[in-house]
Amino acid sequence: MTVIGIDPGSRHFGYGIVDAKQMKLIHANTINLSHDISLPYRLKSIYEILLSMVEKYSPDEMAVEKIFVGKKITSSFVLGYARAIAFLVAAQKEIPVYEYSSTEIKKALTGYGRAHKVQVKSMVYNFLHIDKKISYDCADALAVAICHINSKTNFM
């Protein structure tokens, strides 16, 4: 089984594909888009790239980080648009989608739901035996995938 993890964002959209059986990194990247590009065109780019990755790697399941609504409500709405793109791609390819909160993800990887980004990234490197540098957005996406794999393993 392969899982694609998604760390949604309209400017930095992380995704990572993991082989659940071998707990091995298949592919990960960050879609980096300029703030100068209007939102509809950033979303279009995310859609096209994510769709091509899903078509290329055929993940069995998708795991997406839930939205945390903070002080900037507008940012949460924009984040919601990026999540909607991931959901659309999943629906088009009939891939089941699972959602996890930031706290759930951190707890699954570090044992502590309020862990710092550096700790989460370090655990992603350890779980997947990564020897190359990856962005925080990639690490977060891979963390969502690992969280999902762990949740399925613990309940099977």
Curated annotation (Swiss-Prot):
Named cofactor requirement(s): Mg(2+)
Assigned keywords, A-Z: Cytoplasm, DNA damage, DNA recombination, DNA repair, DNA-binding, Endonuclease, Hydrolase, Magnesium, Metal-binding, Nuclease
Residues involved in Mg(2+) 2 binding: 65
Keyword DNA damage: yes
GO BP: DNA recombination; DNA repair
Reaction catalysis annotation: Endonucleolytic cleavage at a junction such as a reciprocal single-stranded crossover between two homologous DNA duplexes (Holliday junction)
Subcellular location(s) per record: Cytoplasm
Pfam families in UniProt: RuvC (PF02075)
Annotated Gene Ontology cellular component terms: cytoplasm; Holliday junction resolvase complex
EC assignment: 3.1.21.10
Textual note on the cofactor: Binds 2 Mg(2+) ion per subunit.
List of catalytic residues: 7, 65, 137
An annotated Gene Ontology molecular function: crossover junction DNA endonuclease activity
Domain of life: Bacteria
Record has DNA repair as a keyword: yes
Function of the molecule: The RuvA-RuvB-RuvC complex processes Holliday junction (HJ) DNA during genetic recombination and DNA repair. Endonuclease that resolves HJ intermediates. Cleaves cruciform DNA by making single-stranded nicks across the HJ at symmetrical positions within the homologous arms, yielding a 5'-phosphate and a 3'-hydroxyl group; requires a central core of homology in the junction. The consensus cleavage sequence is 5'-(A/T)TT(C/G)-3'. Cleavage occurs on the 3'-side of the TT dinucleotide at the point of strand exchange.
Family that this chain belongs to: Belongs to the RuvC family.
Family matches, as PANTHER family: CROSSOVER JUNCTION ENDODEOXYRIBONUCLEASE RUVC (PTHR30194:SF3)
Subunit structure: Homodimer which binds Holliday junction (HJ) DNA. The HJ becomes 2-fold symmetrical on binding to RuvC with unstacked arms; it has a different conformation from HJ DNA in complex with RuvA. In the full resolvosome a probable DNA-RuvA(4)-RuvB(12)-RuvC(2) complex forms which resolves the HJ.
Name of protein: Crossover junction endodeoxyribonuclease RuvC
